[in-house]
Amino acid sequence: MFDIQKETIEWAGRPLTIETGRVARQADGAVMVSYGETTVLATAVGVKQAKPGVDFFPLTVNYQEKYFAAGKIPGGFFKREGRPTDKETLTSRLIDRPIRPLFVKGFKNEVQVMLTVLSHDLENDPDIVGMIGASAALVLSGLPFMGPIGAARVGYKDGEYVINPPCDEMDDSELDLVVAGTQDAVMMVESEAKELSEEVMLGAVMAGHKAFQPVIDMIIKLAERAAKEPWDYAPADHSAEEAKVRDLIGDDLAAAYTIVDKTERYKAVGAAKDKAVEALLQTEERPDGIDMTTLKDVMKAVESSIVRGGIIKTGKRIDGRSLDQVRSIVSEAGILPRTHGSALFTRGETQALVVATLGTGEDEQFIDALTGTYKERFMLHYNFPPYSVGETSFRLAPGRREIGHGKLAWRAVKAVLPTKEDFPYTIRLVSEITESNGSSSMATVCGASLSMMDAGVPITRPVSGIAMGLIKDPEGIAVLSDILGDEDHLGDMDFKVAGTTEGVTSLQMDIKIAGIDEEIMKTALAQASGGRLHILEEMGKALGEARTELGEFAPRIETITIPTDKIRDVIGSGGKVIREIVETTGAKVDVNDDGVIKVSSSDGASIKAALDWIHGLTAEPEEGQIYKGKVVKVMDFGAFVNFFGPKDGLVHVSQLKAERVNHPSDVVKEGQEVYVKLLGFDDRGKVRLSMKIIDQETGEEIKKEQEDAE
């Protein structure tokens, strides 16, 4: 029944197995990939005919984690997997990015790649396993895919690169880098780092590229035995149409791309394209075989050729800048009066409004993952409203792109955050992209640094980010700093680098051609370093370091530690005591199992009141100290006084006054406030108090009477 084909290698100390022919046999390509005891099912299916009018490549990558893979049952009412988590969305994008450029140019049939995590050993991250599975499934499917690709994770510890480090070792690594590529070139890089040099980052990319070559070899060996017949697909030749369009509007497009203002440039480009549509589609002499979809492809090819050729020949960009020149920058901090911290970062026609909000432990985000439930104290949310590019849209919820850009900026600034012990606040950053013409994620990085410094978050150093581009033509190569939207759209690379004056904190690279080599990456990293440092200088004009005080409306947090056996006294039966503290003082109180209590409020008086209350509940009275108390009960032998939180003590009749007392009621009444001194404890641990050695008017000790009492 089954024609099972399998390849196994030892890879970074663990067995890697790719198997096909047993599961999902009706898919065009399907493999089960196992690394250690982590298993992912990868499938690829392509539609045989492209939909009419489609002018893009409809590739969808869906990565999904099944809770049963880690022996868990989903939470919530329905107890089943629901909408994709951020981890699933980010991994889907991670896998999409290196495979998309390797489909034959012009292929527009719908393709769906699905990766399902079936088993997770909590040691080997399934994202790398899924990427290898996607590559193998596509190669076996017969689809016009110019793979295979390989992928690897690279860590960095004690000056050494570590290939595919186990999940539990990543906290000790200075680097978390994922690299994917072909036998000859790198296709994709994604990373976060703890301020590492460009040389270390480049070395990690090349170490990963070398490490996954055996994976590519095993996919090729498997394909030799199990691959399906290649699809009969050849891209259409539109060279004649391109020549016609170039003759019609080539000069118009060239003139349009000399206009610096984005809006005016788009109007001129649109007018040129309308001219081509009218000339070729709205006349009786309409050329054979050309429709609107084809014409769009042809116009884009001509447009790309004109822009790219102009940059290579002249060394000047669309907006007149040189190759390594950064757009003009304006940085502003503290622009919103009631927020905890805010910044407006403008670079050319790209603008990010970033707002920082500080919270307490109650505001931490709970994340339910296959590896277990954990809390995240730092969040960064990126929003790209349609007005930022002068458009309208009905979809206002964050999409895959927004989640991905937010995570990129999150990685970039994470390395400079203070520890939880030094700064016990939850931090949420929100980036609203108010204008966009390229590199909005890197504008978010810059705005995030400024907004946190404005909020008084003691980050170690500011972080800046820059997006690099590439034009790679037979006539030459040009690496571009701080790319525009058009340069991203018509170029060959989107290479984002973020970091401080001390090193790189994040690097992300996407390639639209068949990969780039080490020399191009080296050039791009060096050029990006100069751009980043320039941006940091411009940011410093607004705010060079974190403010010494928190924002006026930010909560203050005070931390104290109590003995663990006193936690029950603070919480009370069913939470009665802690609720009373919160309701009465207005402060938030967070009690940890280890006895650490965090009291927070934007009002200092509320914090003090709550701390005093907690101190009264948990502290022990000190012998020899004077306390103000209240008489709670009068007996024949003395009076009981509540003097220290819930603690009562006895003032014996002989300690009420220096003179002889017939009955305690002659001296004190219930509810009366008195001053008492703690003399000590009797053999049974009972408190001994004295009133007669204290001046009841002033609360001061009477020396002579003290000597007589002792």
Curated annotation (Swiss-Prot):
It is an enzyme of class 2 (transferase). One of its GO terms (biological process) is mRNA catabolic process. It is found in: Cytoplasm. One of its GO terms (molecular function) is 3'-5'-RNA exonuclease activity. Its cofactor is Mg(2+). It comes from the Bacteria. This is Polyribonucleotide nucleotidyltransferase. It comes from Maricaulis maris (strain MCS10). The lineage of its organism: Bacteria, Pseudomonadati, Pseudomonadota, Alphaproteobacteria, Maricaulales.
